[in-house]
Amino acid sequence: MNANLAHQPPQGRLSLLALSALGIVFGDIGTSPLYTFKTILGTGGQPTGAAAVLGALSLVIWTLFIITTVKYVMFAMRVDNDGEGGILALMALLGVKRQRRPTIVALGLFGAALIYGDGAITPAISVLSALEGLNMAAPALQPYVVPAAVVILLALFAIQSRGTASIGRLFGPVMLLWFVTIAVLGLVGIARHPTVFAAINPSYGLSYLVSNGATGFLVLGSVFLCVTGAEALYADMGHFGAGPIKLAWFAVVFPSLIINYAGQAALVIDGAPTDGNIFFRLCPDGLLLPLIGLATLATIIASQSVITGAFSMTRQAIQLGWMPRLAIKQTSSEGYGQIYVGAVNWLLMLVTVSLTIGFGKSDNLASAYGIAVSLTMLMTSALLFIAMREIWQWSLLAAGAVAGVFLTIDSAFFLANLTKIAEGGYVPLLLATSVYGLMWIWHRGAAAVAERMRERLIPVAQFMADIAEKKVPRVPGTAVFLTRTERGAPPVMLWHVKHNRALHEHLLVLRVEVISIPWVAPDDRLKIEELAPNVWRAEATFGFMERPHIPELLKASKARGCRIDLDDITYYVGHETVTARDDGKGLPAWQEQLFAAMERNSLHVSDFFSLPRDSVVEIGRQVAI
């Protein structure tokens, strides 16, 4: 869905979009009650007296309010890149201003890389935590929890290539049922100890932190689990618009979460055992199996949302030039976000299943979970500070005061999670560092290739004069030469004439550029200039959420006076084989080799631009970087 269409939905569609948002945006944060409170209670040395439980609940309530409601709903969602949100869209928006660009890029890219860690851990911890309810309903089934989780996860990743549009309509209603259910369960718990709502007073949380010292600080790492998934409110803004997401949050999600956490706290204060999963203890025994089934569905939906988010972010990174071209399959005509990226899907599946088997329990995975999300949020806060200064034109004092609160809180959560590195926190950090390194090397390598291409440019006028002087034969038809250079005759054209000693009658030099906004208006898509008789240069501009389709683009070029025969076109694309420079001025050898490997395995240019294969001529040449 185009962000501009969803940005301000008609009033009649607001509720429907909010229902859809429940199934796409809130799956991750909505299933957090399955493991958050039990992880808090399981933190080493955590007291379970009434004061301590109220303190922990107070921390959860105010974390949800400050991080999700204030930071993301009230502030981050006001900074949209032509309707799109998320850390990469924010990076692209701020990157338009050249000041501090390296800092902005580093923050945005590493924050994006961390989301892959989240994408691998969320399905594992969510599905495991739901199935672990079987330990209470049918203890004899405990040995089958991990195998069942693995089967569900394998099936989930296996169906991605077929798309989920047909069943996606059910996600919203299922999640609505989930939120109503957890709210009702919470009310059942609250009825046993109604005074639990005293925890709304933040003094309980502050007192807990002060009185428990190191234990209180460590508990922050577990408290943070209640807001994993909050980044999705901002990242998925382009699919629904801010209005439906805010409506779903305030009307359904936020109150349901608070009520359920309060119910779990009330149950503990009332004397319920804290071993096992306190969430499932809210449920009457006779309804436990149906609840486990509903929880499993909710966690599958949450996992699906995270996987789809990883696909979407990959497409953004490719279009912005930070990842190699990968095969992207449109799985449905109903929405632009319905895509499948096979390489990402199978990598996530491998990591997710390995984590499920390796860690075995959701409690163990909780240690690995929070660190990736907390660091992403910290980087988002840093970018928000820059946005306050550069976009909203706030004073340094005002921006520092507001962003300083976010940065302080995010830093506290990150430091608390940092203590879990040895317990599994290294997993998302290692994955994120690897992805970040590959993105940076790809960008450096692509820039080096482009620079080498520019060194060999000659003006088009000089090229045409040489053609006339050498009496190069002209053959009927149209040749379209794709180039990455902003000016001059493209290298692929020079190579073509050198090797084939002929040139078509009609020539079009086409450069495709992806810019740092998600969508480009049709009137701004194409600029055409006639360089010589029957020789044109076209500049095509796309947003980072769009997929370039060259044959469709050429229809528009003919309508603008470019006299080409659409039925007789040959596309010429260059293929550069990367080698190391022998003057010591290029990329380090290991970076050159990594870039060359990524280039060899990337999607072919003709497939990326949807060129008809039987009309493509590829000309290769070695380029030393």
From Swiss-Prot:
Pfam families: K_trans, K_trans_C. The keyword NAD does not apply. It catalyses: K(+)(in) + H(+)(in) = K(+)(out) + H(+)(out). GO terms for molecular function: potassium ion transmembrane transporter activity; symporter activity. It comes from the Bacteria. Its main location: membrane. InterPro entries: K+_transporter, K_trans_C, K_trans_N, Kup. It is a multi-pass membrane protein. Keywords: Cell inner membrane, Cell membrane, Ion transport, Membrane, Potassium, Potassium transport, Symport, Transmembrane, Transmembrane helix, Transport. The chain crosses the membrane at residues 14-34, 50-70, 104-124, 139-159, 170-190, 213-233, 249-269, 287-307, 339-359, 368-388, 396-416, 421-441. It is found in: Cell inner membrane. One of its GO terms (cellular component) is plasma membrane. Transport of potassium into the cell. Likely operates as a K(+):H(+) symporter. PANTHER family: K+ POTASSIUM TRANSPORTER, OSMOTIC STRESS POTASSIUM TRANSPORTER. Belongs to the HAK/KUP transporter (TC 2.A.72) family. This is Probable potassium transport system protein Kup 1. It comes from Bradyrhizobium sp. (strain ORS 278). The gene is kup1.
